[in-house]
């Protein structure tokens, strides 16, 4: 039977192509961050998370700007008593000293890119790298992070254009391409209006959604209706659905199906059990029905996923 390999927690190992592979500490899963230096004080990192929480690199007294793009899953950001959730396709700009050093992922599954900038180490103005790119990293951080330290924009064609190609960059052009795309991203942000912001959720809404999810996962064979959930948690159906959708990005039923399929994917990655055996564990006695459910969540069939399971990463190969 296959077993997980234990990685050195938090270490960064330099690879031949200049990247660093980090393994942030996580209590309930696996987190891998593949980072590439781009310019002085600027790096691009590919985040592959199969956990609900991990510890970020954090240096007290140093204020960094993080530009995050979510490809899959969901990223939680807490600012005071408000919670924001980054969904697939969304972009967020945050300041490291304005948020907790722990990153949280409600669905336990996240893939995305983070561009980190240290204004104290980065060029004061990017025009020194390319003429007419009159962008100052310190001014960008002031623009997006002055009021609370967080800004988020919903998925758009412009954001997708910038980030989509970064997930499949050929190795032979990678270093130069990263430079071009980071400059494009920062130039785009310099012209982006700041009034766009995803809605915030209260601690009460987050706690309600979390309680519902824990209940669903404790009894996966049951399929409670919204009315039954409403009675159990003493909240209206509207409160439950709005809170759950806000935190997890899907209905309770879709969430439960997704959690089952991601758990099945873990078994496909790390064990030699047959697909039919794994299907039975999650309540499917028909391999075809399981394959359809698996494909609807993961995007490929169980057999195709298993054959390419080592590539469960958003970093370019």
Give residue ranges: language-model regions.
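Amphipathic alpha-helical recognition patches that constitute DNA-binding helices
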Residues: 66, 177, 251
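N-terminal functional module of multi-domain proteins
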Residues: 15-111
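Short Lys/Arg-enriched alpha/beta "domain-start" segment
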Residues: 1-14
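Conserved phosphate-binding and hydrolysis motifs of nucleotide-dependent enzymes
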Residues: 249, 283, 294-295, 299-302
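Terminal helix-turn-helix DNA-binding modules in bacterial transcription factors
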Residues: 210-218, 223-228, 246-288, 307-317
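Alpha-helical bundle regulatory/interaction domains
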Residues: 76-78, 83-205, 209, 226-227, ...
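Short hydrophobic/aromatic patch on the recognition helix
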Residues: 239-240, 244, 289-290, 294
